[in-house]
């Protein structure tokens, strides 16, 4: 893997945990709290940017994750910020984060194991 891959993976994992925290109060709480909304939106922006920087070899081995969806969602959030539908952000936060979290955790573990002395 290229340098900084661990940092990108750690960024993704940290942002997933942040999204989980911000959405733990439920849909209504999220939809009524601008601070929570902004936190989740920013976290998705970071996830999408970090996904774009990951080695294609690493993510191709994890087809259960729709990696390009995260990169594309980031682009929508950045370039069409005035059209953001909070219901879509909520749905995105509830649907596939578990698979992404699992894949990122496995990739980080793979890096740890490859760095371990033999």
Give residue spans per PLM region.
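Solvent-exposed interaction patches of small proteins and small membrane subunits
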Residues: 1-118
């Amino acid at each position: 893997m290229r340098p900084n891959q661990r940092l990108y993976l750690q960024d993704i994992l940290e942002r997933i945990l942040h999204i989980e925290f911000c959405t733990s109060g439920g849909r209504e709480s999220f939809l009524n709290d601008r601070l929570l909304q902004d936190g989740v939106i920013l976290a998705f922006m970071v996830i999408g940017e970090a996904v774009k920087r990951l080695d294609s070899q690493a993510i191709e081995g994890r087809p259960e994750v729709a990696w390009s969806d995260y990169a594309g969602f980031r682009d929508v959030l950045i370039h069409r910020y005035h059209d953001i539908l909070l219901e879509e952000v909520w749905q995105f936060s509830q649907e596939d984060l578990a698979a992404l979290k699992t894949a990122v955790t496995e990739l980080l573990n793979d890096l740890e194991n490859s760095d371990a002395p033999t």
